[in-house]
Amino acid sequence: PDELIEKFGADTLRLYEMFLGPLEQYKPWDTKGINGVHNFLRKFWRLVHDHENNFSVCESNPTKENYKTLHKTIKKVEEEIERYSFNTVVSTFMICINELTDQKCNNREIISDFTILLSSYAPHISEEICFEVRKNTGMQKPVHKIT
């Protein structure tokens, strides 16, 4: 796994292992699908960074559609955690980011809440984004102390 962490990062490997399938199911080790998980994290990163890789979120109020996407994600993640279905939790995160991207939503409030939700699964990227989201807001706690 060291080579995979070097190439893709620890968050990608962590999410990929969860994405492989249910905990109780045997899964042969195969890294063919790791790019999909890596692309998800990159897509999340691009949602909150401009073309020059500067952090960029909007301050406007989220739309009803933005809230609906976030709340649907929170509900689904809660349900899947109860079943220990971490593979579908990761899938739910991917769907959420796809929908937020389609909505062109990089709203500070929505991104902050999504980052907190993601933080137990991808702590490194969550910490970086949470730091930027909360910069200059007076709420500079590490993400693991928020959850």
What are these regions (language model features)?
Residues 3-147:
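Helix-rich, typically C-terminal accessory recognition domains appended to large enzymatic cores
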